[in-house]
């Protein structure tokens, strides 16, 4: 709760306890601009007092460097699937997983429109922003589940669609790549561009996304995208081994 944080000297107390103070981005870089004016100024001042900032995507790195003139580093989103005994898929059904619910934050409606072009059953995870009457659509809404349950369930899907305009950690596209599931999504999200380069479109380019959905019906193109995203995942900084090397 921001109001509660503002009741005490957060940065002063942190600097008394720590030699270095670091802030880790959570959510899109513009999120604080939905706060009250007083809260926005308080958070901006706090950002300028941290010794270093960690950010999700390179565009976030540039944003924070610009407004704070501080040291900002990219903190890759990390998957520890192998540690939990989770293995990539080896069989799946003809079904589409979209990446969120019917709210602007997730872009669920746009994902649904694109997903319809596969002529397959469509599923969606249940997120905290799920709205009333979503269950009336021809979408199978998964129950709330743990991450382990989610990643195992995702393995049974043919393709992912994630037209999410809110760029943050990028876990959905990352999870898809782990399983070798091609995922259509927006540029600007590093996990999307790094792992699914052939399936990344500009923000709002629904026409391009629909063209890709139709193109993925071609088995050779599908296999190319499937193998590419899995290989990209294995050599990316989103794995534990390579992330450790990157941070060192």
Feature-to-residue mapping (PLM):
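Extended catalytic core of nucleotide-activated donor transferases of GT-like folds
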Residues: 1-64
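Conserved catalytic-core segment of nucleotide-activated headgroup transferases in glycan assembly
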Residues: 80-147
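Acidic donor-binding loop of glycosyltransferase active sites
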Residues: 155-168, 181
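A charged, aromatic-enriched C-terminal amphipathic alpha-helix characteristic of glycosyltransferases
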Residues: 217-248
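Donor nucleotide-sugar binding/catalytic pocket of nucleotide-sugar-dependent glycosyltransferases
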Residues: 51-65, 69-85
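Short alpha-helical segment that forms part of, or immediately flanks, the ligand-binding pocket
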Residues: 151, 173-179, 192
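Short acidic alpha-helix that forms the nucleotide-activated donor recognition element
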Residues: 146-157, 178
């Amino acid at each position: 709760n921001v109001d509660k944080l503002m009741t005490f000297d957060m940065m002063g107390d942190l600097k008394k306890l720590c030699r270095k103070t670091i802030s880790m981005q959570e959510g899109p870089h513009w999120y604080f601009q939905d706060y009250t004016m007083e809260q926005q100024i308080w958070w901006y001042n706090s950002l300028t007092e941290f010794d270093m900032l960690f950010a999700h995507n390179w565009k976030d790195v540039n944003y924070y460097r610009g407004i704070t003139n501080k040291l900002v580093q990219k903190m890759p989103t990390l998957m520890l699937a192998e540690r939990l005994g989770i293995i990539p898929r080896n069989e799946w059904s003809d079904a589409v997983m979209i990446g969120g619910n019917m709210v602007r934050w997730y872009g669920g409606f746009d994902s649904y429109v694109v997903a319809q072009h596969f002529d397959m059953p469509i599923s969606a995870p249940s997120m905290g922003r799920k709205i009333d009457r979503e269950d009336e659509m021809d979408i199978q809404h998964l129950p709330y589940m743990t991450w382990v349950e989610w990643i195992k369930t995702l393995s049974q899907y043919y393709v992912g669609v994630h037209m999410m305009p809110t760029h943050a950690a990028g876990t959905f596209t990352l999870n898809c790549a782990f399983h070798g599931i091609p995922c259509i999504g927006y540029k600007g999200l590093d996990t999307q561009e790094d792992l699914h380069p052939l399936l990344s479109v500009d923000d709002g380019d629904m026409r391009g996304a629909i063209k890709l959905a139709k193109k993925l019906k071609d088995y050779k193109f599908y296999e190319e995208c499937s193998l590419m995203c899995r290989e990209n995942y294995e050599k990316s900084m989103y794995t534990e081994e390579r992330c450790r090397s990157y941070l060192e």
